């Protein structure tokens, strides 16, 4: 099994994010999204707009995403 991983904050999920994740999933059999924890998002004041749990829920609803895991890597 080939596992692919993407990292990001995915705040305000948009079509570009979805296309990126679909392309990543097409490169393997299982896609893990490493989702940046709220306190490590460095997109400016007031970000993230959506809390980690909300962003994770949206990502998990995408057919191309197999797993969402927290990460401390800023994005």
PLM regions with names:
Residues 1-75:
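Nucleotidyltransferase catalytic core that binds NTPs
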């Amino acid at each position: 099994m080939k596992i692919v991983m993407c990292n990001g904050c995915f705040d305000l999920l948009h079509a570009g994010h979805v296309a990126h994740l679909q392309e990543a999933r097409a490169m393997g059999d299982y896609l893990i999204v490493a989702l940046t924890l709220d306190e490590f998002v460095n997109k400016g004041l007031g970000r993230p707009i959506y809390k980690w749990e909300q962003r994770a829920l949206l990502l998990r609803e995408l057919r191309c995403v197999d797993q969402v895991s927290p990460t401390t890597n800023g994005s």
